[in-house]
């Protein structure tokens, strides 16, 4: 509620601190998703101070605030120089990977006649979201069941006269493997179709590795590429870049409107008004770390991933999916007695968060880990926790009320309001608004048994209920 009289800054900050008590920790590497910690206080300070310095600057009109143009040129130029481009490579600074992908899809749509986007099943849902928003149709292709990489022959079969864009991941988020970008980009070029490389998660770690597969703008046929700086760039959240091979493609990503009596609108992104804090934070972070700093952090993250894989090899009940090219690892069960959803809850008791991933297209349920610059120091402790948790959960399954899974599957969601949905969630032990890392095995088990469309409908209702006053 809005107070009648203003509150003091100290009071407000104290309340924020109380609200954050239920959050997962953002530092020290115990949360293997969502957050990226360089473990270097001076880098965080540079990013934070620059962010605050530009907090009130509005990027809506670059002619009013030319500092935003100067900063964007510097950030885009720095990213392009590392990712196969040069000082003349066009690009756009965006709020995140989804917005970068949205612009790449829009550019492809507006420069061609196709209305289909060909993508591997492992491609990020941001592409499906872009298709949904932009009136396009996603055409998914399978990945190799062993390597989990996109299969070029399947991509070739999917490309047709209606194709607007072909997508490859570098790497795919779920399993950390890089698709065969040269082969896929060549196929797209042969058909005269743009090819986008989604390097949102890997674009700022792969370039610093000596043995990274080819994936960037230097690969013939790659016409656009997205790279998040708030991931392995370690910048404050809200920082991504989309690069284009031509000025024509970047112009097609823009939006302008003069068909009204107000000010003329020209947007480089989906957003109009936008604070310049993230842009300044990204610029400062890039310069505070420099190439040598990123090289060191990438090596440490990869060393952590290698140590994790080595340690998991000594736990017979677990296995790594695929052969990751980046410091992202997915752990699946190698023993029917070990349920990965139950395992995640057990590991959480020791203060570690592993991200559950549901089964899909023949890929088993698994636990995702993103390893960062601070992960190496704690990976042995995590392996000890994993080994102990595996021993503790053998043979255990989520405690589900009888018939609940069938009830959920047959539920008419349109006939259930948020209050009733909250009551349904409480039946499986879910308390909305509870602390991060609360038990989720029961929910994940139910979702895992449902078709993707049903999962999505339930997740929408979950989000609606989470933001409902009935959950206060």
Predicted regions and their residues:
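Short Gly/Ser/Thr- and Asp/Glu-enriched loop/turn motifs at secondary-structure junctions
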Residues: 87-88, 322-328, 360-366
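Long, structured ligand/cofactor-binding scaffold of large enzymes
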Residues: 48-92, 97-100, 105-110
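Conserved PLP-enzyme active-site core in the AAT-like
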Residues: 88, 92-268
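Non-catalytic terminal extensions of PLP-dependent enzymes
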Residues: 1-62, 68-69, 73-77, 332-472
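Active-site C-terminal subdomain of aminotransferase-like
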Residues: 211, 215-327, 331-336
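Predominant activation on well-ordered alpha-helical scaffold segments within soluble catalytic domains
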Residues: 72-80, 102-106, 128, 182-185, ...
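Alpha-helical scaffolding segments of alpha/beta enzyme cores, especially the outer helices
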Residues: 182-186, 190, 307, 342, ...
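A short linear hydrophobic-aromatic micro-motif
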Residues: 89, 316-319, 353-358
């Amino acid at each position: 509620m809005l107070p009648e009289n203003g509150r003091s800054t100290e009071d407000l900050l104290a309340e924020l601190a109380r609200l954050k008590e239920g959050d997962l920790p953002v530092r020290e590497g115990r949360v293997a998703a969502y957050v990226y910690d360089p473990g270097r206080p001076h880098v965080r300070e540079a990013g934070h101070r620059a962010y605050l310095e530009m907090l009130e600057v509005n990027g809506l009109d670059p002619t009013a605030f030319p500092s935003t143009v100067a900063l964007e040129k510097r950030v885009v130029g720095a990213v392009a120089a590392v990712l196969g481009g040069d000082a003349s490579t066009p690009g756009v600074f965006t709020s995140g990977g989804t917005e970068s992908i949205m612009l790449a899809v829009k550019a492809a749509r507006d420069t061609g006649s196709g209305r289909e986007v060909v993508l591997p099943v492992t491609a990020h849902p941001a592409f499906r979201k872009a298709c949904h928003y932009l009136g396009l149709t996603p055409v998914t292709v399978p990945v190799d069941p062993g390597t989990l990489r996109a299969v070029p022959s399947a991509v070739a079969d999917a490309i047709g006269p209606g194709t607007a864009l072909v997508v490859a991941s570098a790497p795919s988020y779920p399993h950390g493997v890089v698709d065969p970008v040269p082969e896929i980009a060549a196929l797209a070029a042969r058909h005269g179709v743009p090819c986008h490389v989604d390097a949102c998660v890997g674009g700022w770690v792969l370039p610093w590795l000596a043995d990274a597969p080819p994936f960037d703008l230097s690969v013939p046929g790659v016409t656009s590429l997205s790279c998040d700086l708030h991931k392995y760039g370690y910048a404050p959240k809200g920082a991504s870049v989309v690069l284009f091979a031509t000025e024509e493609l970047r112009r097609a990503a823009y939006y302008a409107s003069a068909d009204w009596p107000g000010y003329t609108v020209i947007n480089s992104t989906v957003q109009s008004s936008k604070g310049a804090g993230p842009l300044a934070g990204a610029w400062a972070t890039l310069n505070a770390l420099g190439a040598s700093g990123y090289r060191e952090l990438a090596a440490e993250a990869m060393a952590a991933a290698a140590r994790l894989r080595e340690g998991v090899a000594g736990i017979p009940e677990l296995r790594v999916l695929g052969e990751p090219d980046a410091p992202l690892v997915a752990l699946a069960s190698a023993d029917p007695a070990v349920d990965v959803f139950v395992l995640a809850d057990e590991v959480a008791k020791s203060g570690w968060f592993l991200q559950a991933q549901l089964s899909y297209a023949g890929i088993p349920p698994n636990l995702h880990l993103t390893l960062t610059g601070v992960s190496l120091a704690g990976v042995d402790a995590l392996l000890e926790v994993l080994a102990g948790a595996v021993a503790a959960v053998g043979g255990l399954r989520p405690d589900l009320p009888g018939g609940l899974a069938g009830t959920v599957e047959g539920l008419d969601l349109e006939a259930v309001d948020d209050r009733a949905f909250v009551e349904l969630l409480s039946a499986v032990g879910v308390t909305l608004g509870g602390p991060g890392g609360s038990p989720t095995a029961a929910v994940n088990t139910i979702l895992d048994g449902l078709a993707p469309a049903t999962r999505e409908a339930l997740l929408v209702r979950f989000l609606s209920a989470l933001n409902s006053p009935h959950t206060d």
